[in-house]
Amino acid sequence: MLTTAKANPLEALRSAKENKELSGQLEHHRSLRAIKLKVLLYREEREAAGVPPDVISRECATLHGSLLRNYMEEAQEARRLGAAELAQKTAERFASAFQVRPGSLGDAFDRRHREVERQAAEGARKEAIERRIVERVKRIKGE
């Protein structure tokens, strides 16, 4: 009697992070393969042209090193941009979660700016008190 174990479909699914990592590894592999293919095609082209093997080996090594260096620089730049983008998104999420209003760095510590805000708030408070007093006086006179 042969029974088949049913796999949990939720366990079969990978997380988005795992998929992104696997996709990155696959892209890395494809890029390295493309570099090797370019070097191989160059080698065949040079052999068909009748160039000596030692010269071909040096040229291919130089080409491979150059292509690999360019790829690594591009990959590093892409990683740096991805990290910066992720940091920006995280900062935006925190800012919205804590209801931080946009402004320049150090606004909260600018004494002149804080003093102007304090004076404006004090003026608004005094105006509100004066309005209430005027309304009371009008009500009292009206009675």
Curated annotation (Swiss-Prot):
Protein name listed in UniProt: Pre-mRNA-splicing factor U5-Cwc21
Q: Which residues form the signal peptide?
A: none
Its localization reads: Cytoplasm; Nucleus
Chain's role = Essential protein involved in pre-mRNA cis- and trans-splicing. May function at or prior to the first catalytic step of splicing at the catalytic center of the spliceosome. May do so by stabilizing the catalytic center or the position of the RNA substrate.
Q: Name one GO cellular component term.
A: spliceosomal snRNP complex
Q: Write down the species.
A: Trypanosoma brucei brucei (strain 927/4 GUTat10.1)
Query: Which residue intervals define the domain CWF21 in the entry?
Result: 27-70
Which GO BP terms, alphabetically?
mRNA splicing, via spliceosome; RNA splicing
